[in-house]
A protein has these predicted regions:
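OB-fold and OB-like single-stranded nucleic-acid-recognition modules
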Residues: 1-167
């Protein structure tokens, strides 16, 4: 997904390229991070439907990747732009540009989606609704939370396409 990125260069420069999952763990001790994520998870645990907004986008995405089984079966709605992975047919990623602390840790964050017979060109903004499952994603050789789409609607780009991690 991060075409042209060189992990060795990133290590030398002290930067990382982030995509899919926001990761704020480097800003906490491990016990403080676990405590903070557990506290945040309680806000969503009892809900069957989760509206992901500009304000909670990074928080919810980080929680979905940390605790995917707690989100399986939940209905999720959010807005983002389309990225078509050229190596995997049937999946589209829906991303937002996100900033955790500063521009050096910015990236694209979101979920792989499937289930819509509609296809959209890269960078098309859409509002999606679907149900979370966890499946093995061959391209990344790992299990990922996947949004099985029930609704997709093309929308305009938000005034500010960026989302921010707020504590």
């Amino acid at each position: 997904l991060a075409a042209g990125s060189d992990p060795n260069q990133a290590d030398q420069e002290g930067t990382t390229i982030q995509y899919l999952k926001p990761d704020t763990s480097s800003y906490f001790t491990s016990s403080a991070y676990e405590k903070e994520m557990t506290r945040e998870l309680t806000k969503y645990k009892g809900r069957e439907t989760i509206q992901i907004t500009t304000e909670n986008y990074m928080e919810v995405m980080e929680l979905i990747y940390l605790y995917p089984n707690d989100f399986v079966g939940k209905k999720v709605t959010y807005t983002g732009f389309v990225y078509n992975d050229p190596q995997t047919k049937g999946y589209q990623f829906i991303f937002r540009f996100g900033i955790i602390h500063c521009i050096a840790d910015s990236g694209v964050y979101g979920l792989a989606t499937r289930g819509s017979d509609q296809t959209f060109k890269d960078n098309t903004w859409v509002k999606v609704t679907g149900t979370i499952t966890v499946d093995y994603y061959q391209n990344l050789k790992q299990s990922l939370p996947i949004l099985n789409l029930t609704e997709v609607k093309e929308v305009g780009q938000p005034d500010n396409p960026y989302v921010y991690r707020v504590f």
